[in-house]
From Swiss-Prot:
It comes from Homo sapiens. The gene is ZBTB49. GO terms for cellular component: cytoplasm; cytosol; microtubule cytoskeleton; nucleoplasm; nucleus. Induction: Induced by the DNA-damaging agent etoposide. This induction is mediated by TP53 at the transcriptional level. It comes from the Eukaryota. A zinc finger (C2H2-type) spans 395-417, 423-445, 451-473, 479-501, 507-529, 535-557, 563-585. Residues 165-203, 275-294 are annotated as: Disordered. This is Zinc finger and BTB domain-containing protein 49. Keywords: Activator, Cell cycle, Cytoplasm, DNA-binding, Metal-binding, Nucleus, Repeat, Transcription, Transcription regulation, Zinc, Zinc-finger. One of its GO terms (molecular function) is DNA-binding transcription factor binding.
């Protein structure tokens, strides 16, 4: 190979591997939430759109570009084409690829799409089905132009090219030698059509496109490196393509026919002529010398389509086996095979033994086509064959019996039983059972997060993390704990939570012997012994042992309070504080109806312990008339505080306004009693003429009874025991307010005032 071509192939191969691993990529394309990493130089080299985009956004920092492309697979295939020169075009994706290439202005892809569309609109022969031309030339069309040039060593390429030129000369001199297109028609149509007509139909194919589009393809493609040492059976698959390139028509114009012939075997039986099923793949040998010359390089030839062809052929053969398993179709198929075998035996006799053997391997083993040598004789054989094909679809595990459709999936499943983890991280030494898990793990070391949440813009290293994260925005918690009923957004968190209910503590600390039921708790505990604090705050430099501790600390700088109380809308920085706060709401709601009941019980208890005389009541009159500005200590219950401020304050104002006009007469009466002279004038009471009807009555409207009197006596005694200082000094001191007893409701204070007035009347008598 040319040194320049080798150098360019190696360069593009390395760039492609870097893109797959996500290394040294300087831009990211986001299409509907799916991220594609690539190199700007490669994108700009193939696309005029990307070239202008990168030049105009040179000052952009993040290098993330959101593309308005309708189909995600279109951009993915175009990126693969840029790095591998490989593009799969078929009837399903041709329109998508054409639209995407026009949007991104990729001229090479546009040329390939137009060439594909031209080949699909070729004038068909009379007997050909309408969809046969397009289907036969669609899947492997791009490979046809590079079949000769891309896989051979230089000396073999020269030899094959010389043979091809010789074949071209022979074909021009003998136009009736190779009617390769006639094999696509029925036996009756072959007899009616002239041989030069078939040649003309094949030469009219406008499929002459340059080879330089595909010369670099297999040198660095994944399949080339992955299956370079594959079994010989896969190599035989490409032999029909190679035989046709050297035998059919001209060098360039025969290649579409060869590809179409190989694809024709993949078609379902109803679209194929009757004589085609039993006919060998290459039943015509226009020139024996050309076959012998190119047979050697054919065996070394490898097409990238081999894997896809085998999979598609297998599915087609299954469908065919199911159809021919019916009795009616069995008879018809046998008749067609017998009639077709008569026409093909004469052609097959001219071939050598080696050619026959290779053709049988290709037609029977790889393409699963029923040839003349393997034609079933009875319906029972067809049924056995269909059962064999059905059994091949399932690969069962020997240990648990779980079925799989592909052996590779079965191989991965077996590792779950054996515990084999062949993939090792070269950074931390952790092992994985699958290569994809290792690749995701490596992103955590490099910090790469290619997956983005479309709602909040948060980035993740794995696609599964995005799916689990999206549930947070919806607030849905479908996974419930069957023990405590707590809900979780994903199953892994629920599984971790269930370990808290188990009493088994299998994780033990080696240093102190403390056990834990979860491994993460043990890891966090070990940090206390080592003193390691790997997480540091970028704002203040403080270090922490866990990442969660660092996140909570950062909230002190940002002021973020993500946890909100649903009752009072108060926000908190930690979820534990929110849970304690919610318990306060529940406790307050349970205790508020029982406040008065607790107070009444306390008053009755104190009444039984103490019995007061009339003299004690006269001594306790000093606490009855407090200034309006003095307030009793506030109880934690807010409802009681409001009741005291609104109701009792008005009662005291009314009492003072009625007592003050009688101060002079009361002073004369108190002068007769030396024990009363020491009391201040503020404590003087009104005479007997006081009208009870002017004082506010309780809500019930009933006067105080004997039970109310007992309650008042105990309350006054409790107030008197707090100290012997005058009321004025006690009211103004902070210590007195802090050491004050229970809070009394407004009804109790009203009762105290009424009893004081009654005691004064008794003293006057």
């Amino acid at each position: 190979m040319d040194p320049v071509a080798t150098h360019s192939c190696h360069l593009l191969q390395q760039l492609h591997e870097q893109r797959i691993q996500g290394l040294l990529c300087d831009c990211m394309l986001v299409v509907k939430g799916v991220c594609f990493k690539a190199h700007k130089n490669v994108l700009a080299a193939f696309s005029q759109y990307f070239r202008s985009l990168f030049q105009n956004s040179s000052s952009q920092k993040n290098d993330v570009f959101h593309l308005d492309v309708k189909n995600v697979s279109g951009i993915g295939q175009i990126l693969d084409f840029m790095y591998t020169s490989h593009l799969d075009l078929n009837q399903d994706n041709i329109q998508v690829m054409l639209d995407t290439a026009q949007c991104l202005q990729v001229q090479n892809v546009l040329s390939l799409c137009h060439t594909f569309l031209k080949s699909a609109t070729v004038v068909q022969p009379p007997g050909m089905p309408c969809n046969s031309t397009l289907s036969l030339q669609s899947t492997l069309t791009p490979d046809a132009t590079c079949v000769i040039s891309e896989n051979y060593p230089p000396h073999l390429l020269q030899e094959c090219s010389a043979d091809a030129q010789q074949n071209k000369t022979l074909d021009e001199s003998h136009p009736h030698a190779s009617p390769s297109v006639n094999r696509h028609h029925s036996a009756g149509e072959i007899s009616k059509q002239a041989p030069d007509t078939s040649d003309g139909s094949c030469t009219e194919l406008p499929f002459k496109q340059p080879n330089y589009y595909y010369k670099l393809r297999n040198f660095y493609s994944k399949q080339y490196h992955k299956h370079a040492a594959g079994p010989s059976q896969e190599r035989v698959v490409e032999q029909p393509f190679a035989f046709s390139t050297s035998t059919d028509l001209t060098t360039v114009e025969s290649q579409p026919c060869a590809v179409s012939h190989s694809e024709c075997i993949l078609e379902s039986p109803e679209h194929l002529p009757s004589n085609f099923l039993a006919q060998p793949v290459n039943d015509s040998a226009p020139h024996p010398e050309s076959d012998a010359t190119c047979q050697q390089p054919v065996k070394q030839m490898r097409l990238k389509k081999a894997i896809h062809l085998k999979k598609l052929n297998f599915l087609k053969s299954q469908k065919y086996a199911e159809q021919v398993s019916e009795p009616k179709s069995d008879d018809g198929l046998t008749k067609r095979l017998e009639s077709a075998s008569k026409n093909t035996l004469e052609k097959a006799s001219s071939q050598s033994a080696e050619e026959k053997e290779s053709e049988e391997v290709v037609s029977c083993e790889n393409f699963n086509c029923i040839s003349e040598t393997e034609r079933p004789e009875d319906p029972a054989a067809l049924e056995d064959q269909s059962q064999t094909l059905q059994s091949q679809r399932q690969y069962a595990c020997e240990l648990c019996g779980k079925p799989f459709k592909h052996p590779s999936n079965l191989e991965l499943h077996k590792r779950s039983h054996t515990g084999e983890k062949p993939f090792e991280c070269n950074i931390c030494g952790k092992h994985f059972s699958q290569a994809g898990n290792l690749q995701t793990h490596l992103r955590r070391h490099s910090g790469e997060k290619p997956y983005i949440c479309e709602i909040c813009g948060k980035r993740f290293a794995a696609s599964g993390d995005v799916q689990r994260h999206i549930i947070i925005h919806s607030g849905e918690k479908p996974h419930l704990c069957d023990i405590c009923g707590r809900g979780f957004s994903n199953f892994s968190n629920l599984k971790e939570h269930k370990k808290t209910h188990t009493a088994d503590k299998v994780f033990t600390c080696d240093e102190c012997g403390k056990s834990f039921n979860m491994q993460r708790k043990l890891v966090k505990h070990r940090i206390r012994h080592t003193g390691e604090r790997p997480y540091s705050c970028s704002a203040c430099g403080k270090c922490f042992g866990g990442s969660g501790d660092l996140r909570r600390h950062v909230r002190t700088h940002t002021g973020e309070k993500p946890y909100t109380c649903e009752i009072c809308n108060k926000c908190f920085t930690r979820s534990a504080v929110l849970r304690r706060h919610k318990k306060m709401h529940c406790k307050a709601g349970d205790e508020s109806p029982d406040v008065l009941e607790e107070l009444s019980q306390a008053i009755e208890t104190s009444d039984l312990e103490k019995s007061q005389s009339s003299d004690s009541f006269s001594q306790d009159t000093s606490v009855t008339l407090m200034p309006v500005s003095v307030k009793l200590p506030v109880h934690p219950v807010e409802n009681s505080v409001a009741e005291f401020d609104s109701h009792s304050g008005g009662s005291y104002c009314k009492l003072r306004s009625m007592i003050q006009p009688h101060g002079v007469s009361d002073q004369e009466k108190l002068s007769l009693d030396p024990g009363k002279l020491a009391k201040p004038q503020m404590q003087q009471t009104q005479p007997q003429a006081y009208a009870y009807s002017d004082v506010d009555t309780p809500a019930g409207g009933e006067p105080l009874q004997a039970d109310g009197m007992a309650m008042i006596r105990s309350s006054l005694a409790a107030l008197d025991n707090h100290g012997g200082d005058p009321l004025g000094s006690r009211a103004s001191s902070t210590t007195y307010r802090n050491s004050e007893g229970q809070f009394f409701s407004s009804m109790t204070l009203w009762g105290l005032a009424m009893k004081t007035l009654q005691n004064e009347n008794e003293l006057d008598q």
